[in-house]
From Swiss-Prot:
Lineage: Bacteria, Pseudomonadati, Pseudomonadota, Alphaproteobacteria, Rhodobacterales
Record-level Gene Ontology MF annotations: D-cysteine desulfhydrase activity; L-cysteate sulfo-lyase activity
Enzyme class: lyase
N-terminal signal peptide: none
Protein name in UniProt: L-cysteate sulfo-lyase
Function: Catalyzes the desulfonation and deamination of L-cysteate, yielding pyruvate, sulphite and ammonium. Involved in sulfolactate degradation.
Organism expressing this protein natively: Roseovarius nubinhibens (strain ATCC BAA-591 / DSM 15170 / ISM)
Induction description: Induced during growth on sulfolactate or cysteate.
This protein's record includes keyword Lyase: yes
Top-rank lineage group of the source organism: Bacteria
Annotated Gene3D superfamilies: 3.40.50.1100
Length: 338
């Protein structure tokens, strides 16, 4: 599969590490756990969206854009990485931040990813939750274009066929690492939200005939909607790659049992996952996305979903910067001993 024919801005630190998690594996007593460290992509604390932005921002440059506009939730990792990428390329960035939680916490609204958005020079504006954010963004972009501004819009999560190419590439990268290290991967698990990561991964895996089951742990939409979104995007991505029909509907699997009360609202199991990964492996998760993916992964291990001795890769999508917007979700009073 010749990805080099697509414009790309090489910014990410790739390949990201593929590591075995011995202490977490021993603690859970199930499969042999490995982690693909896409929290280490290098741009402004890293994260999965940088892979997508390599292709999206290259397209923006080719179109002569002066401003990139995107949207996401208040503590959006995607927004932060877009702001950082734009700064790196000397472009302006404007972000529409959707209030999906109703939180009035100062750190949630001004710290974490929001602080980094502004540090990278982005301008932001808030929008109420529940609207069609991509449509609102396009409406605003059209108004700016009418004033003569050259605006390139990026959908939430960078999730369109161009952005999904970043995770087609990740699938190729992961398979190459496994082949070089003699690692037979039995399953891949990751958090899934805006659909681009899962769509790109499954397209890349199927294009390479890898035959590795891929499971997305949902963080927002119900299962039927999540799987529909991923499948439709995977089909469009495969079409763009020149391998239409390579992804079947049954290849797209999401488990949405770990969303909790809603997107961006921490769960008890997610907080447990954050503490387990931090205390056992010194790896940081975030309450919005990676922690819910890890919580589902941990629960499925405990329920025997994966066989003992199987090798399962958890793809870490990053997001640790959001921890500083959720300090109120933690209670470490017992850790103070003096």
């Amino acid at each position: 599969m010749h990805l080099a024919r697509f414009p790309r801005r090489f910014i990410a630190h790739l390949p990201t590490p593929l590591e075995r998690l011995d202490r977490l594996s021993a603690e859970l007593g199930g499969p042999e756990i490995w982690i693909k460290r896409d929290d280490c992509t290098g741009l402004s604390t890293g994260g999965n969206k940088t892979r997508k932005l390599e292709f999206l921002m290259a397209e923006a440059e080719l179109q002569g854009a002066e401003i990139v506009m995107t949207q996401g939730a208040t503590q959006s990792n995607h927004a932060r990485q877009t702001a950082a990428f734009a700064a790196k390329l000397g472009m302006k960035c404007h972000i529409l931040l959707e209030d999906r939680t109703g939180s009035n916490e100062a750190n949630y609204n001004h710290n974490g990813n929001v602080l980094l958005d502004h540090l990278h020079g982005a301008t932001t504006e808030k929008r109420p939750g529940g609207g069609d954010m991509n449509a609102e963004m396009e409406k605003l972009a059209d108004e700016w274009r009418a004033d003569g501004k050259k605006v390139y819009t990026i959908p939430g999560g960078g999730s369109n066929p161009t952005g999904a190419l970043g995770y087609v590439n990740c699938a190729f990268e992961l398979l190459a690492q496994a082949n070089d290290g003699g690692l037979k991967i039995d399953h891949i698990v990751h958090a899934t939200g805006s659909a681009g990561t899962q769509a790109g991964l499954i397209t890349g895996l199927k294009a390479m005939n890898a035959q590795i089951p891929l499971l997305g742990i949902g963080v927002r939409a119900p299962k039927p909607k999540q799987e529909e979104n991923v499948y439709n995007l995977a089909c469009a991505t495969a079409e763009k790659l020149g391998c239409p029909g390579v992804v079947a509907r049954e290849d797209v699997v999401a488990n949405t049992d770990y969303v909790g009360q809603g997107y961006g609202i921490p769960t008890e199991s997610g907080m447990e996952a954050i503490k387990m990964f931090a205390e056992l492996e010194s790896i940081l998760l975030d309450p919005v996305y990676s922690a819910k993916g890890a919580a589902g992964f941990i629960d499925l291990i405990r329920k025997g979903h994966f066989k003992k001795g199987e090798r399962v890769v958890f793809l870490h999508t990053g997001g640790a910067a959001a921890l500083f917007g959720y300090d109120g979700a933690f209670d470490f009073s017992s850790r103070w001993v003096g």
